[in-house]
């Protein structure tokens, strides 16, 4: 069952869902909560590795990822990060989100941004039960013009579903959870699979 606005507000009031800083009532509508863009970004450095072998030895994957990913880029409030056509970049939400073991979250991009070519999540839009941390955004500019992205702009919306029961293996209890408590634009850790 997807939570409606009044259920989302109740879960926030009761501390079952935690969003910090807590969004104002104007950002909760129908079935979702608007989330804002954070200040941290990472980009892919072109031509620093010939390829990444996604099924190769984990040490080679880790080395290739380290070569192609930039250090974290901090964009101050009021300034912009420019995402160029065909560019993939990582960023994070401004808010940190914590979910209990019986709720799953879903991140949706904004239609108004998609109509300009911005994909907010390339594929990964599920926020697992037991998740706690900021949400990494996988931006792609499929449009024809560079897009200026500014910290604290509305970037997407979260909605929540109750599970049929409490998850036996929520994210925060899994020993192999690669992105547990992430706070920045964390690069891929596929080498830890």
From Swiss-Prot:
Metabolic or biological pathway, per its Swiss-Prot or TrEMBL entry: Pyrimidine metabolism; dUMP biosynthesis; dUMP from dCTP (dUTP route): step 1/2
EC numbers for this chain: 3.5.4.13
Record-linked InterPro entries: dCTP_deaminase (IPR011962), dUTPase-like_sf (IPR036157), dUTPase_trimeric (IPR033704)
Main enzyme class: hydrolase
Catalytic reaction(s) noted: dCTP + H2O + H(+) = dUTP + NH4(+)
Keyword flag Nucleotide-binding: yes
Intrachain S-S bonds: none
Alphabetized UniProt keyword annotations: Hydrolase, Nucleotide metabolism, Nucleotide-binding
GO terms of molecular function: dCTP deaminase activity; nucleotide binding
The keyword Hydrolase is annotated on this UniProt entry: yes
Residues that hold dCTP according to the record: 110-115, 128, 136-138, 171, 178, 182
Domain of life: Bacteria
GO biological process, one term: nucleobase-containing small molecule interconversion
Active site: 138 (proton donor/acceptor)
UniProt similarity note: Belongs to the dCTP deaminase family.
HAMAP family with a match to the protein in the record: dCTP_deaminase
Role noted for this protein: Catalyzes the deamination of dCTP to dUTP.
Subunit structure, as described in the record: Homotrimer.
Name recorded for this polypeptide: dCTP deaminase
Lineage, uppermost ranks: Bacteria, Pseudomonadati, Pseudomonadota, Gammaproteobacteria, Aeromonadales
